[in-house]
A protein has these predicted regions:
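Conserved beta-strand/loop subsegment of P-loop NTPase cores
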Residues: 57-64, 86-97, 116-123
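N-terminal accessory targeting/assembly segments
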Residues: 1-73
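Residue-level signal for inorganic ion chemistry
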Residues: 22, 83, 95
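Residues at alpha-helix caps and immediate loop-helix transition turns in enzyme cores, especially N-
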Residues: 72-75, 104-105
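Canonical P-loop GTPase G-domain recognition
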Residues: 99-131
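Histidine-anchored nucleotide/phosphate-binding helix
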Residues: 74-87
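Conserved nucleotide-binding/hydrolysis micro-motifs of P-loop NTPases
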Residues: 31-33, 66-69, 96-101, 125-128
């Protein structure tokens, strides 16, 4: 494998097709020594999200904080629904579990694992505990 620095062909720019992270592309190498190429074609995308612009995702990890800021479960549910709609496997990462004095982590974990989602618990500056 090698890295080739590429720009989109003028035709793609005229059609307002912009390559994004995750795109599968066909390229033409124009300078082997300088590792330069041109993107000739962008293959059909399996999925696409606008913010941040990415394509062909297979999974996405939603990181939520148990405290500071408090987890917004409605927002998390909306993000999960959007991921499912786009055919992207959501994974939930609950961070700052060391600050969970009310045992909220266990409740959140139970809710989401019961409906089939993978939940990872973390203390970002220490370790990851996989479920």
């Amino acid at each position: 494998k090698k890295i080739i620095n590429c720009n989109a062909r003028g035709k793609l720019k005229k059609e307002e097709i912009t390559p994004v992270v995750g795109d599968i592309v066909k390229i033409e190498i124009i300078d082997e020594e300088k590792k330069l190429g041109i993107i000739n074609k962008i293959e059909n995308r399996k999925n696409y999200i606008k913010r941040p612009k990415m394509a062909n995702l297979t999974q996405i990890i939603f990181v939520v904080s148990i405290k500071m800021p408090k987890t917004d479960l409605l927002l998390l549910d909306k993000q999960i629904a959007y991921a499912e709609y786009k055919g992207i496997r959501p994974i939930i990462c609950i961070n700052k579990i060391d600050l969970d004095e009310d045992n909220i982590t266990k409740n959140i974990e139970e809710i989401y694992t019961k409906i089939g989602y993978k939940v990872i618990k973390t203390v970002a500056n220490k370790s990851i505990r996989n479920r």
